[in-house]
Amino acid sequence: MQSIFNNKYQFKNIETKYNTLWDTTKLYKWKNSGTNQFVIDTPPPTISGQLHIGHVFSYCHTDFIARYQRMLGKDVFYPIGFDDNGLPTERLVEKTKKIRATDISRKEFKTICTQVSHEFRIQFKQLFQSIGISYDWDLEYHTISKDIQKISQTSFINLYNKGKLYRKLQPIFWDCIDKTAIARAEVEENELSSFMNTIAFSTEAGKAINIATTRPELMPACVAVFFNPSDIRYQDLLGQNAIVPIFGNKVKILSDDQVKIDKGTGLVMCCTFGDEMDVYWWNKHNLDTKIIISKSGTIDHLNTLQGQDVCKQLHGLSITEARALIIEILERNNLLIQKQEITHNVKCAERSGAPIEILLSHQWFIKVVDIKHELLKQVQKINWHPQSMRKQIEIWIEGLNWDWCISRQRYFGVPFPVWYSKDGKIILPDINKLPIDPTNDLPEGYQDTEIEVETDVMDTWATSSLSTQFHNISATPADLRAQSHEIIRSWAFYTILQAYYHNNDIPWKNIMISGWCLAEDKTKMSKSKGNVLTPNKLLDEYGADVVRYWTANSKLGADTTFSNEILKLGKRFTTKLWNASKFVSMFIDQYSEPDLQYITETMDKWILSKLYKVIVKATESFNSFEYCIALDCIESFFWKDFCDNYLELSKKRAYGELISKQEHLSAVNTLSFVLRELLKMLAPFMPYVTEEIYRTLYSSNNSIHSHNTWPAADVNLYNESDELLGETFIEILNQVRKVKASAQLSVKYKINKLIINKHFPVSLENDLKAVCNADCIVYDNRQNDNKEQLLVSVEFENVQIT
């Protein structure tokens, strides 16, 4: 039995052995029992590049909960999917294959995307298995598969029929790099350098007025000038016309309370469209439309009263080129009053990083703005872990003023099940015919000459937000959604929206939010910064259990800096667990069940009382998804109570030296029981080392990760008086250790006489003498001036130290 402990823990061999065993025995298979289930809505990783340590960080957090729930006896539904369509995957393909989607046929590009997605899915699966994620791989899904496309297209048609989805020509966010519309959730603000340019305008009556702008290239698209109605400087201008310099266009001067008096000159030009405020004014005041930026991000469609030569020069220029030319012309004509360098927040596309433009375009939208109040109610029905994360989504919903644009002008995605007749009628297929691809299929009763094909594809979130519908399970809402905080406004929000529209319900009872894994410089890991850590290197050096230990040392929802020091602590912890198990294995019979009826000694009952409290705390923490707190209390008990104290004080009785059989059996059964329960509590975090020890000492046929293996918080384990006596014992031991340390003596150094000011039960004297290495214990009440204070003196060869 002890042969495995003759060597150091060889994690590589152990991991290979158990990955094979768990896979072949289908240990984590969902039984679809219909009762006592725990359903997890797993985040499907996006096929957008190599997984880094940050992905391992968050995916392990979910696995802790899945393993715990399985050990509770639950039938755990824990699928894995891959979000292998959409813009992120296309960008990966273009980068890795050094091609552009526009340079080859649509069919050829989609074929290449399919091949690349398959290759990356294999890599992802290997990583997840190597880190010990306990997915049921029989539940694997791909968002580009025919089955998922059918679900997504069915959702689209149902929402359309309910009036929750529409197609309309309206302003949208446009990414000029990827040449596609994007949703508000895909827009982020980046701090960029720019110039605030103060430009000389005039009124039609000839009065000089100045307007400051960072986007002078939009002057040909100016449709109005605004001031705040409370700004007395400009109240006399209301209703007059302003003349746009260079181009000569006349635009109305209007007032609106959204103008910031203290920004720029207090006058602002409204262009179609420079930002969201322009859209707001355009709608509110029913302004004209002048779109001068093409979908490629160049200047186009210029139509001005004057400056035709300038228009010709601007035509076809990029936005930055046009801006520079306009500034040059303004300076040349003494129309540039001031040019001030600034840094400001600019809305950029999340994927490409390019500043977004707002263009008019026909797109598909899911209604959001009209039901914000209802969505906030849904959010409040869900238990958020940590609770503070709920505020993020509430702020997001409250600030929404755009519906969700779900159409993308891309290629590798779920097709819209839509055709258009020549007169613009929307044609939908029979749901029973789904999935369809309108670029290949025809609607029933139509010829190809009678229709126009919808070539756009759906936003990948429009599909992945239906993840709770991907498998036909009766348990709804799901018990848990686990995800990171940066996709609260996308994946979490969209899933809540879809569940409300389709089921009038919440998608899950609980949502557990992980933070980011930050680089050692405390910044977000990024390939461009060169601070990304690859999991395989860490797994090769430390092993899966140690890496998982590191991921568990993060507060729920908090960003955590990567730390080699915590990995080293994890390695030390694994080694100590192995060695402690080796020690216990010396005294117990292999596969024998520890018998609590043999546990009679006070210090054995003390460690059981401490164990009981740890089981209660760990169980409560896991039930509230606080895996970090669970690990902390288990680890503290292991190091301080079990290893530092109990193993030392029970050694003599475990070896059976000069004691009764009863004392020996009490120690041996306690060691066996406490170690077994410790292994069980550590199993969700460190599945490999705990499995190896458990199968070696306790059960060769049953896995520690099987159902109903979580320790029971049996109140019979706890005895308050034994706990208090034990704490006094430990206090004496700590004082003795302190005395020896201050005298620079070994902890094993013999004590001639241990003097205590309080009477101590005789039943504990043997353990106390053994652990302190004391010849005798003397009770001296004369030094007991303070009745409450415990005083300990130690005598070494007639030298007494207090």
UniProtKB/Swiss-Prot annotation:
Instruction: Write down the InterPro entries for this protein, in alphabetical order.
Output: aa-tRNA-synth_I_CS, aa-tRNA-synth_Ia, Anticodon_Ia_Val, M/V/L/I-tRNA-synth_anticd-bd, Rossmann-like_a/b/a_fold, tRNAsynth_Ia_anticodon-bd, Val/Leu/Ile-tRNA-synth_edit, Valine-tRNA_ligase_type_2
GO function terms (MF aspect): aminoacyl-tRNA deacylase activity; ATP binding; valine-tRNA ligase activity
Q: Does the keyword Hydrolase apply?
A: no
Q: Where in the cell is the protein located?
A: Cytoplasm
| PROSITE patterns with a match to the protein in the record | AA_TRNA_LIGASE_I
Motif 'KMSKS' region is found at 524-528
Which UniProt key words apply to this protein? Aminoacyl-tRNA synthetase, ATP-binding, Cytoplasm, Ligase, Nucleotide-binding, Protein biosynthesis
Span of the annotated motif 'HIGH' region: 45-55
Q: Name one GO biological process term.
A: valyl-tRNA aminoacylation
Tell me which stretches of the chain form a coiled coil: none
Give its E.C. classification number: 6.1.1.9
Which NCBIfam families has this protein been placed in? PRK13208.1 (NF009687), valS (TIGR00422)
Self-association state and partner proteins as the record states: Monomer.
Q: What is this protein called?
A: Valine--tRNA ligase
| Organism, as annotated | Ehrlichia canis (strain Jake)
Cite the source lineage: Bacteria, Pseudomonadati, Pseudomonadota, Alphaproteobacteria, Rickettsiales
